[in-house]
Each structure stands twice: as structure tokens, then as C-alpha cells.
């Protein structure tokens, strides 16, 4: 995924720095789009793969690499076609990885928890829908004094708000 939905990097170290979550992107099926580099003294043509609306999009999987064992597991998130995975966040104990799965229409988001050991889905904590657009921009942030609660940022009512949730997926309150 490109610089959208709050994604500004492709790798995320665990809290202790012993595991690395990362995006793996296959864009071989995406049509090339020509861009002119106007910063060069003489303009140069650069082809980039960009999934235009209605055309085939890239496929992304999320992996977790263990440098000590040199093993990688991939999250069992199902078919990555026409889905975005964003807002990656580690559980404080690094046993779970949280991310938001967003459909290509960008109107249905799910906060999902995955096992770091197996890559299996532990559960969907909550879902957010909107008739027009859901734009998850920020990963969840766990409270430093209470690992059973986290803050989620959303514009679900048209304004940017912070929400306090429990790791059971239940809304505690709007902050």
C-alpha cells in the first residue's frame, strides 16, 4: 500500500525489537501508469504501477519475521484481492498483531487481532462502516498503564475523535 490510510513505512518492530512485521506487495498484475519527472533537466518518463479505479489492484500480505530463528510467518488474512491492510500495531506483550482490514470501496473497516505465533486470526474487535468513506489513519495505541485498553482515532461521526476500547473490542467511552 502506498502512502495512504496513515501508512508511511513498511516495517514495524515489536516492542522489544525481536520481531519485525512487514508488508509484502505483489503489484505484477497492476497496469503501468506513465509519469513525467519534471525535476530532471530534461523531462524523463517513469512508469509506475498504479491501480486506477475499476482496474486490478495489487495484493498485499503481512508477514512477521523472527531474526533469531530466521523464520517468517504470514498472517492468514484470506484472499488479499481488493483489500487494504493498514494501521499495524503490536500488542504490548508482542503476542498479537493488530491491523485494520479495509475493503477496496473504503467504506467498511475491521480492527483485527492476529496471533504472532501462528498468523491465525484471533478475532475481529469491531467494525466501522460508512455509506461513503472510512479513512483509518492511525494505529491503535495501548495505554502505558493498562495493556487491556487502547485508544482508537476515528472520524466516524464526521469529526475526529478518540475512543477508548478494551481488548475485548468493547467501547469504554469517547474521550
Q: Model regions: which residues?
A:
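Short loop/turn segments that connect beta-strands within beta-propeller blades
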Residues: 66-70, 116-119, 166-170
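Predominantly five- to eight-bladed beta-propeller fold
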Residues: 1-12, 19-74
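A short beta-strand motif characteristic of beta-propeller blades
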Residues: 1, 71-77, 123-130, 171-175
Amino acid at each position: 500500500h502506498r502512502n495512504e490510510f496513515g501508512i508511511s513505512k513498511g516495517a514495524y518492530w515489536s516492542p522489544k525489537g525481536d520481531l519485525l512485521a512487514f508488508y509484502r506487495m505483489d503489484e505484477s498484475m497492476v497496469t503501468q501508469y506513465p509519469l513525467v519527472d519534471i525535476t530532471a533537466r530534461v523531462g524523463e518518463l517513469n512508469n509506475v504501477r498504479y491501480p486506477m479505479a475499476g482496474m486490478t489492484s495489487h495484493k498485499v500480505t503481512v508477514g512477521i519475521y523472527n531474526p533469531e530463528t530466521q523464520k517468517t510467518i504470514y498472517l492468514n488474512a484470506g484472499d488479499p484481492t481488493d483489500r487494504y491492510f493498514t494501521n499495524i500495531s503490536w500488542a504490548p506483550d508482542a503476542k498479537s498483531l493488530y491491523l485494520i482490514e479495509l475493503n477496496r470501496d473504503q467504506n467498511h473497516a475491521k480492527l483485527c487481532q492476529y496471533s504472532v505465533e501462528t498468523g491465525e486470526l484471533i478475532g475481529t474487535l469491531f467494525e466501522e462502516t460508512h455509506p461513503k468513506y472510512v479513512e483509518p489513519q492511525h494505529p491503535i495505541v495501548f495505554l502505558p498503564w493498562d495493556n487491556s485498553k487502547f485508544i482508537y482515532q476515528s472520524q466516524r461521526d464526521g469529526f475526529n475523535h478518540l475512543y477508548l476500547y478494551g481488548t475485548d473490542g468493547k467501547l469504554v467511552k469517547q474521550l
